[in-house]
Amino acid sequence: MNSENIIEQAFGKLQIYIKPKEKVQAENLLHRLRSRQLYRELVKYAKEDHLINASVYQTHHGYSLHGKISSRNVELANEDLSMCVELIDEKEKLEAFCIKHADLLRGKMIVFKPVEFWQIK
């Protein structure tokens, strides 16, 4: 395939590292009764904000923000082991997402990387 068949577009990728046990602060009684996991809320908000892609990846071994090394046991989930919420879109839209949801993202490890989005003709 030659490059004439590929349309390139500059995008960005955010990687937000959080722990699976992190919850969204309850705003009312209904939310207190039904706990909301932060990673699910971030994906929901990404969809509402029309970002092109949102994915969640579970890690198996590692650490984040200088914390202790954790591993995932086959039989038991480790609520302290980091997971990654990955968002892809234009840099400006990712910046707007971070500003809009700053209360949820404050204190989290967030990595931005420029990427190319390819469409095949």
How would you describe each model-predicted region?
Residues 1-121:
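Positively charged, small/polar-rich N-terminal and surface patches that mediate targeting and assembly
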